[in-house]
C-alpha cells in the first residue's frame, strides 16, 4: 500500500515529494502472498528519488515462504528406525492443494531432500545409452523402492542435471533407469555437457532423491503428496517444541519491470532482506543446463559440424533462465545497498534485460541454490546459444552496471553448475571488490556465446575481487572465467586462492585460477595474485594481453582485494567448509624415462591430461625427461610405466636445493616468462660423500651466501636440484630468450666464493652412465612433442 500511496503522490505531483519519497520498513517478517511489483509509475527522479529502506537498526524481511507447524513424533515404521525418531506434520496447502517445494530449512539451516547416498558420498553410473535414453546404475540397496516423484541428480562435466525418474528396472545388483520427457530426450541428445564414462577418473557421479524409502539420515526430509504429510529426520539437538521449519512458496519476491520506452528509474532499496524463494521448474520439466545454470530447452548434435559463425561447432542449444528472488527488467539508476539475499532456491538477484547504470553495493548473498547475481541476456529462448548477440535496439543490453563490495558465500548449493556472479552479453560493467567463497563451481563468469565474433560485449572490468574456496563440486572451473570477444575488457588486481578438491570431478586436474575460454578476445589480464600459474587459454581469439599473474605481484594487491569499508562487517558472514579438502598446489617435479623407441604422441597425450604447468619435454641420448609443476607425480609415473613397459621410469620430487630469485635477491621481481635448462649427473658412490653434498646444500644459504648472490647476479630465476638415488637433476631457469652461456659467467664475476663452491662440488659429482670420460653434467635438449 505504501508503494501505491507513493505512486499517487507522483501522479498528482504533490509538492511534499520534491526531495524524494522514503518508504520505511519496520523490524519484522513480512510474509508475501504475491511478489512486490515495482513499475515505471513508481519511478523517482534524480532530484526526487524513491527510497525503500529499513528503519534504523531494524531488519525487515520479505519472506516468500510458509512456516510448517504441528510437528509430532511419527510412531510408524521407517527403515527399522525406533518409533518417534522421525517427525511428521501436515503439509501446508494453498487453495486446497499441497504446496510443492524442493527445499526445506530447519532453524535457518537447509535440510536434505531424502537421497540414496550417505552424507556427501555419491555413486557412479555404470553406463548411459543415448539411443534408449536409459542409464544403468549400481543398485545394491534393495530397501530403495521406486515411487513417482523420484529423481536422479547427476554430475556431468561442468554442470549437473535433475532428471525425473519414469521407472527403475532392477536386475541383480544393477538397475536400468528411465526418465520422463522432456528432459529424457534433451539429456540423451545434447552432446555437451553429458554423462561421462572414464576408467581413470570414474564415471559420472550421481544419487537418487525424493523418495520415502531413502529417508534414513538426520537432516533428511520427504514430502508425501499422496497422504499430505511431510516427514523430517531431525538433527542432533533440534527440539520438536521450538523448531522453526520453513518451506519456500513464491518463486519471485520482488519484480521491478519497465520497458524500453518507459523504464523504472531512480529507486533505492536499502537494508531489506529477501528470504525463502522457491523454484519448481525442475519438478515440472527436469533441469538439464548448458552452463551457468541456463537450462536447455532443446539441444542436439549436428550431423555435419559447422555454422556460419563457427566452422567447428558440433552442437546446437537453446536455453532458458532460472527464476530469481529479485528480478529486474528495463530499469536504470537503481541501487541495492546493504540488503540480504538468503535461503533461496535459485538465483538471488537478476538484472535480466534492458538495465543500465544500476548499483549493487554492500549486500549479503548467502545460502543460495543458484547464482547470486545474474546480469544481462545470455541467450533469449528463441536465440541459439552460440551466436553473438547484437540486438537492433541496444536498449535491450545491460550496461554500465556496478557490482561492488558484496559478500557472496555458500551459493550454487542446489544447481552446482551455477556461479557467484554471472554476466552474459553485457557492456561497460564493473565487478569490483567483492568477496566470493564456498561456491560449487566458478567465482565470476563473464561472457556468453563461445565465439570470437563481434557482439555487444565490450569495456567490462573485473577488478580487486577476493575469490576463494570455490570448485567445491565441479571442475573445468576457475576463479574468473570468460567467453567470447570483449574489446577493452580487463581482469586486473584480483586475489584468487584456495580451491576446493572435488571428489566427483570428471578431470581432477582441470581446476584453474584464471580461464579465458572459447573465443575470449581483447582482454587485459594483469597483476592478479594467484598462488601458482594454473591458468588456461582455451581456443582464444586475438588481442589478449597477459602480464604478471602470479604469487610475485605486489603484496598490496592481495591486501586491497575484497570488501572495503563501510561494508567490511560482511566478512563476519563468510562461509568456509572446513570439512572439505583443498587442492594441493602443484609442485615442480621431474619424471625420467630411460629407454628407446618412445611413442611421443601417446606420451604427450597422457601427460597433457595431467594439466602440468609450464610442462616441457627434454632428451639426452636414451633419457626422456618431463618437467613442470604437477600434481599426482606418482600416478603419472605409474601411468607412464604402463604406457612404456620397456622403459625405466623414475620420479624426482622435493628438491634438495631450491633457489628462487624472488625470495633471495633484494628488490627483485621475477621475469614474466622463463626458459628452463635441465642437466643431470650422479653423486659419487661413497655414501659419506653423498651425505656431505646434501649437508652443504642444506646450509649453503647460511654458510655460502655468495653462491646465491652469484645466481642473483646472473639473473637466474630459479635453480633447483632434485635427487633420486645417486642421480641428480639440475634445473636452471632464466628469463625467456636469455642465453645461459652468457648469464652463467656472471655467477663467478668478482665472486671468488662461487669458484670455491664449484671446485668443492666436483668431488661429489660424476657422470651418469653413457657420459664421456671426465664428463659430469650433461644437458638435455628441449623437444617439441608435436
Per-region residue spans from a language model:
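An amphipathic, aromatic/His-enriched active-site/gating alpha helix that lines ligand/cofactor pockets
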Residues: 611-616, 629-656, 714, 734-777
Amino acid at each position: 500500500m505504501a508503494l501505491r500511496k507513493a505512486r499517487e503522490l507522483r501522479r498528482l505531483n504533490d509538492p511534499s515529494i520534491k526531495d524524494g519519497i522514503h518508504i520505511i520498513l519496520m523490524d519484522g517478517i513480512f510474509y508475501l502472498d504475491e511478489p512486490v511489483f515495482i513499475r515505471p509509475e513508481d519511478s523517482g527522479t534524480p532530484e526526487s528519488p524513491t527510497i525503500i529502506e529499513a528503519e534504523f537498526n531494524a531488519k525487515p524481511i520479505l519472506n516468500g515462504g510458509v512456516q510448517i507447524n504441528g510437528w509430532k513424533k511419527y510412531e510408524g515404521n521407517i527403515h527399522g528406525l525406533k518409533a518417534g525418531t522421525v517427525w511428521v506434520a501436515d503439509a501446508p496447502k494453498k487453495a486446497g492443494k499441497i504446496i510443492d517445494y524442493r527445499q526445506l530449512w530447519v532453524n535457518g539451516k537447509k535440510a536434505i531432500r531424502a537421497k540414496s547416498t550417505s552424507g556427501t558420498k555419491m555413486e557412479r553410473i555404470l553406463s548411459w545409452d543415448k539411443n534408449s535414453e536409459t542409464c544403468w546404475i549400481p543398485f545394491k540397496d534393495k530397501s530403495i523402492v521406486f515411487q513417482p516423484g523420484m529423481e536422479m541428480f547427476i554430475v556431468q562435466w561442468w554442470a549437473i542435471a535433475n532428471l525425473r525418474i519414469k521407472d527403475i528396472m532392477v536386475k541383480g545388483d544393477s538397475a536400468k533407469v528411465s526418465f520422463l520427457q522432456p528432459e529424457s530426450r534433451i539429456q540423451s541428445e545434447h552432446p555437451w555437457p553429458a554423462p561421462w564414462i572414464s576408467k581413470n577418473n570414474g564415471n559420472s557421479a550421481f544419487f537418487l532423491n525424493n523418495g520415502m524409502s531413502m529417508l534414513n539420515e538426520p537432516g533428511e526430509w520427504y514430502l508425501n503428496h499422496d497422504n499430505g504429510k511431510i516427514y523430517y529426520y531431525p538433527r542432533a539437538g533440534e527440539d520438536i517444541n521450538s523448531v522453526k521449519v520453513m518451506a519456500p512458496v513464491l518463486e519471485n519476491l520482488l519484480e521491478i519491470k519497465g520497458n524500453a520506452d518507459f523504464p523504472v528509474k531512480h529507486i533505492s532499496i536499502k537494508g531489506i532482506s529477501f528470504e525463502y524463494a522457491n523454484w519448481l521448474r525442475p519438478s515440472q520439466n527436469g533441469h538439464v543446463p548448458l552452463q551457468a545454470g541456463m537450462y536447455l530447452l532443446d539441444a542436439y548434435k549436428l550431423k555435419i559440424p559447422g555454422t556460419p559463425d563457427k566452422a567447428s561447432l558440433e552442437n546446437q542449444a537453446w536455453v532458458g533462465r532460472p527464476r530469481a528472488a529479485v528480478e529486474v527488467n528495463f530499469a536504470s539508476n537503481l541501487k541495492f545497498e546493504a540488503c540480504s539475499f538468503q535461503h533461496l532456491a535459485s538465483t538471488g538477484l537478476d538484472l535480466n534485460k534492458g538495465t543500465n547504470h544500476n548499483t549493487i553495493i554492500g549486500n549479503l548473498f548467502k545460502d543460495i541454490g543458484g547464482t547470486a547475481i545474474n546480469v544481462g541476456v545470455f541467450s533469449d529462448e528463441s536465440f541459439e546459444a552460440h551466436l553473438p548477440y547484437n540486438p537492433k535496439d541496444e536498449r535491450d543490453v545491460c550496461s554500465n552496471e556496478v557490482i561492488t563490495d558484496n559478500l557472496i558465500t555458500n551459493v550454487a548449493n542446489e544447481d552446482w553448475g551455477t556461479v557467484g556472479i554471472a554476466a552474459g552479453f553485457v557492456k561497460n560493467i564493473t565487478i569490483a571488490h567483492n568477496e566470493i567463497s564456498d561456491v560449487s563451481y566458478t567465482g565470476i563468469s563473464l561472457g556468453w556465446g563461445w565465439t570470437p565474433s563481434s557482439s555487444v560485449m565490450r569495456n567490462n572490468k573485473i577488478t580487486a575481487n577476493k575469490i576463494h574456496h570455490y570448485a567445491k563440486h565441479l571442475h573445468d572451473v576457475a576463479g574468473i572465467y570468460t567467453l567470447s570477444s570483449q574489446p577493452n575488457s580487463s581482469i586486473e588486481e584480483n586475489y584468487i586462492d584456495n580451491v576446493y578438491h572435488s571428489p566427483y570431478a570428471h578431470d581432477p586436474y582441470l581446476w584453474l585460477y584464471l580461464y579465458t575460454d572459447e573465443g575470449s578476445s581483447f582482454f587485459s589480464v594483469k597483476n592478479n595474485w594467484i598462488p601458482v600459474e594454473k591458468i588456461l587459454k582455451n581456443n582464444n581469439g586475438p588481442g589478449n594481453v597477459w602480464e604478471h599473474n602470479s604469487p610475485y605481484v605486489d603484496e598490496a594487491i592481495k591486501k586491497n582485494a575484497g570488501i572495503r569499508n563501510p561494508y567490511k562487517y560482511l566478512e563476519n558472514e563468510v562461509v568456509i567448509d572446513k570439512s572439505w579438502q583443498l587442492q594441493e598446489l602443484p609442485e615442480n617435479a621431474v619424471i625420467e624415462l630411460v629407454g628407446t623407441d618412445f611413442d611421443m604422441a601417446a606420451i604427450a597425450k597422457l601427460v597433457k591430461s595431467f594439466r602440468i604447468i609450464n610442462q616441457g619435454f627434454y632428451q639426452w641420448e636414451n633419457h626422456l625427461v618431463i618437467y613442470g609443476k604437477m600434481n599426482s607425480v606418482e600416478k603419472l609415473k605409474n601411468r607412464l610405466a604402463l604406457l612404456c613397459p620397456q622403459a625405466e621410469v623414475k620420479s624426482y620430487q622435493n628438491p634438495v636445493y631450491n633457489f628462487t630469485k624472488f625470495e633471495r635477491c633484494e628488490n627483485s621481481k621475477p621475469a614474466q616468462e622463463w626458459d628452463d635448462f635441465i642437466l643431470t649427473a650422479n653423486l659419487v658412490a661413497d655414501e659419506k660423500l653423498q651425505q656431505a653434498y646434501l649437508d652443504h646444500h642444506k646450509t649453503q644459504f647460511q654458510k655460502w651466501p655468495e653462491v646465491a648472490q652469484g645466481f642473483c647476479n646472473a639473473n637466474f630465476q630459479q635453480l633447483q636440484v632434485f635427487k633420486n638415488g645417486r642421480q641428480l637433476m639440475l634445473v636452471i631457469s632464466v628469463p625467456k630468450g636469455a642465453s645461459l652461456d652468457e648469464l652463467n659467467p656472471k655467477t663467478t664475476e668478482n665472486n671468488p666464493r662461487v669458484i670455491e663452491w664449484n671446485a668443492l662440488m666436483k668431488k661429489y659429482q660424476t657422470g651418469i652412465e653413457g657420459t664421456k670420460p671426465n664428463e659430469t653434467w650433461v644437458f638435455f635438449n628441449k623437444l617439441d612433442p608435436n
